[in-house]
Curated annotation (Swiss-Prot):
The keyword tRNA-binding does not apply. Belongs to the ATPase gamma chain family. It is found in: Cell inner membrane. This is ATP synthase gamma chain. PANTHER family: ATP SYNTHASE GAMMA CHAIN, ATP SYNTHASE SUBUNIT GAMMA, MITOCHONDRIAL. SUPFAM superfamilies: ATP synthase (F1-ATPase), gamma subunit (SSF52943). Keywords: ATP synthesis, Cell inner membrane, Cell membrane, CF(1), Hydrogen ion transport, Ion transport, Membrane, Transport. GO terms for biological process: proton motive force-driven plasma membrane ATP synthesis. F-type ATPases have 2 components, CF(1) - the catalytic core - and CF(0) - the membrane proton channel. CF(1) has five subunits: alpha(3), beta(3), gamma(1), delta(1), epsilon(1). CF(0) has three main subunits: a, b and c.
Length: 291
């Protein structure tokens, strides 16, 4: 019964793995819900900031703020690449990296260089492995990242845009659609589009005249930074919800596969045990007949 013992050992090993994947599935489900709640709470803030910023930009057209400049000749681009810090989330990071690398290659074909800020260790390791120009990074952000953890890398990139050392900034992340679907997204963060500060931007439902302190221009300059930071944080929350959803689905599939493997191993074990018993009975019968 040496074979039978080996099969039982395999069954116990798969059962232990199944317990781990089941626990990870439950943890990911809980984390996904919490991340979705944070996303919902952050949206109203971002919308209000955008609305006030749009009003100020339209009433102060000669603001002279570099972050609100548009129509630049593209010579150098920046990327904010958001990925997860951990694996076991299916093809989530691979899909984001595929979209990101395709855009990088397209720019390189036009002779345009790139500078990259990586948020998440998976993206950082991928960029370093192929020799891309990573200028700043933030990794090990945890399940509830603070904005302060992102300010250093983001400020580096925004300052380079203000100095005209970068002419466009892309934001790349995995967008959360639903539990079963996450899609890689790439958005132009800078220059800020007409849908944010132009005539097509969302308007306040009130037509009051606002008075700003110390000045409208100072408030606008402050809000532009807060708006950009809120967009990046929203994308990070989106990516984290996608990560937990993808991990939940992957761990459920692993748990189900482990269950199927256990059934197959039990079937093999029962067959081998039955064969061993049949052999023993045959030997007993043969021995009795010989007597």
């Amino acid at each position: 019964m040496a074979v039978g013992k080996e099969i039982l050992t395999k069954i116990r090993s798969v059962q232990n793995t199944q317990k781990i994947t089941k626990a990870m599935q439950m943890v990911s489900t809980s984390k996904m819900r919490k991340t979705q709640e944070r996303m919902s709470l952050a949206r109203p803030y971002a919308e209000k900031v955008r609305m006030v910023m749009s009003h100020l930009a339209q009433t102060n057209t000669d603001h002279g703020i570099p972050l609100l400049e548009s129509h630049r000749e593209i010579r150098r681009v920046g990327f904010i690449l958001i990925t997860s810090d951990k694996g076991l989330c299916g093809g989530l990071n691979a899909n984001v990296l595929k979209k990101f690398l395709a855009q990088v290659q397209e720019y390189r074909n036009q002779g345009i260089e790139e500078e990259i800020v990586c948020l998440g260790s998976k993206g950082l390791m991928a960029c370093q492995s192929i020799g891309l120009n990573v200028v700043a990074s933030a990794v090990n952000l945890g399940d509830t990242p603070k904005m302060e953890m992102l300010l250093g890398p983001l400020t580096e990139l925004f300052q380079r845009y203000e100095k005209h050392e970068i002419d466009r900034i892309h934001l790349v992340y995995s967008g959360f659609v639903n539990t079963m679907r996450q899609e890689p997204r790439m958005e132009v963060l800078l220059p800020i589009g007409e849908n944010v500060i132009g005539d097509s931007a969302p308007k306040s439902p009130f037509s009051w005249e606002y008075r700003y302190e110390p000045t409208a221009l100072a408030v606008l300059e402050y809000l532009v930074r807060r708006y950009l930071e809120s967009v990046v944080y929203q994308a990070l929350s989106d990516n984290m919800a996608s990560e937990q959803a993808a991990r939940m689905v992957a761990m459920k599939a692993a748990t189900d596969n482990a269950g199927n493997a256990i059934k197959e191993l039990r079937l093999v074990y029962n067959k081998s045990r039955q064969a061993a018993i049949t052999t023993e009975l045959s030997e007993i019968v043969a021995g009795a007949a010989a007597v």
